[in-house]
Design a protein with these regions (language model features):
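Flexible, solvent-exposed loop/hinge segments and secondary-structure transition points
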Residues: 1-145
């Protein structure tokens, strides 16, 4: 997954940090590309943590009009939870295999479109590895379980 995400980042000419987290949001692997921001590892981890823990793509928290973290909605202020680790912006995606969230992938370093493209490359790599073995992997930007 990380190799696919970084390969896509190279194609896009952007320095990314990739975090793969388990279902509890704890990092299994963090890789910061040469030249990527030093803040990337923490931000990518926050995104992977949030996506795994809440079983949804992080950008859905603030997507109008019903994003739950928007002012006036039920989860407004949630980004201050978990000592500020709760990410409500683009770049975090749950890893869903056979309908179950098994982890999260977080990207930091590009703009939202670039982070999403790299994350989708990571998810597609997992799908390519697991689908021949009879497993299904959800590969899309807007994931909410």
């Amino acid at each position: 997954m990380v190799a696919a995400a970084t390969a896509r980042a190279i194609e896009l000419k952007v320095g990314e940090t990739v975090c793969i987290a388990d279902e509890g949001g704890f990092p299994l692997l963090i890789e910061r590309m040469d030249g990527a921001r030093v803040t990337g590892p923490q931000i990518a981890w926050n995104k992977a943590f949030t996506a795994a823990g809440h079983r949804r793509s992080t950008h859905l928290f603030n997507t109008p009009p019903i994003g739950p973290a928007l002012p006036g909605n039920e989860a407004f202020g949630i980004q201050w939870s978990f000592e500020g680790r709760f990410a409500i912006f683009v770049g975090g995606f749950p890893i869903v295999v056979d309908g179950e969230v098994i982890g999260g992938v977080g990207l930091s370093g590009g703009n939202g479109e670039q982070d999403t493209s790299c994350a989708l490359a990571a998810l597609q790599a997992l799908a390519d590895a697991l689908e021949p073995r009879g497993h299904s992997v959800l590969v899309r930007a807007d994931i909410k379980l």
